[in-house]
Amino acid sequence: MELPIDIDLLLIGKTSNGRSALGNTILRRKAFLSKSSQESVTKKVDYHVSNFNNFVIKVFDGPGVGYTCLDDEHSKILVIKAMEFAITTNPRGYHAFLLVTEYGGRFTDKDQDTVTFLKRIFGENFVKNFCILVLTNGDRFESEDNGLTFGEWCKEQTGVFKELLEECCHRVILFDNRTEVEAKKMKQLTDLIEMVDKLRLRGLRYTDENFQKAREAREKLMVEAKEPRVCEETMYEISLILQKLQWTHENVDQKDKRSYFDDLQQRAKNLYDNIQVQDKETGALHDIIHTTKSVQVTIADEIKISQIVIQEREKE
């Protein structure tokens, strides 16, 4: 008797592109929660298993990447942490990432930003080596009746979508998650599994080892997510330091200024050191670090000027 073949899949993509519905179609049952808006639904990772022909299919539904996530520190870090969990939860690794997008919607630069975000999490070559592009809303394609097969339609695409097709080596499939026609359900699932099996036969999986190779880019991504908040907090502290520096310059007797300047220099140094720690040698906070260093230089210049003035007075 032939042993069953394991296939491990991770669903990824933009929020509300039908990832959970696709997962249910692959599993042939309602296992994943499917909503029109999943912004708060799929921040975690869930998985279910089913049998199909001689395959045991394990489907993981990853967190959705919404447009707001790309600009929001908290959401961005949540997604990264959830993706890390998806990798550690399945130590055997994944045969394929199913990158889910909708047929019928224009693939924009924002969508490309989502792909870029995912590449910074999983590695620059993960699309090329492990991704299958799945277009949901297959029923919409058929209703348009444009006289083209799906393959012909793909060949006509231009711009960022064409670039994505080329990057994933034209591993693309159309899915209708709404159909009740059993033959159609079986055909699209069979086509997908055949595509995944070709990846499986290479003997490769995306594992934690692949994930660790992308760690540097992922750390920089997380630091960049914090940059707006770190910048705001830093500029607030710098403003207070410079305000106190100006007050000291105008109101404190020359012979007493040094202790005030030393206190301010220590504050500036603490601020600089704290930002360096948060930067984690990624360079993401370079501009903020440079600004803070300039404040230290300004205070050091004031100390030098103060010392010169005191020395000149002592000569008199």
Q: Could you tell me what each predicted segment is?
A:
Residues 1-59, 67-78, 89-92, 106-132, ...:
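C-terminal non-catalytic interaction/localization modules
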Residues 63, 100-103, 135-138:
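A short beta-strand-to-loop transition that corresponds to the Sensor-1 phosphate-sensing loop
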Residues 83-88:
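Structured alpha-helical segments in the cores of large, soluble enzyme domains
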Residues 99-100, 175:
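Short beta-strands and strand-loop turn motifs
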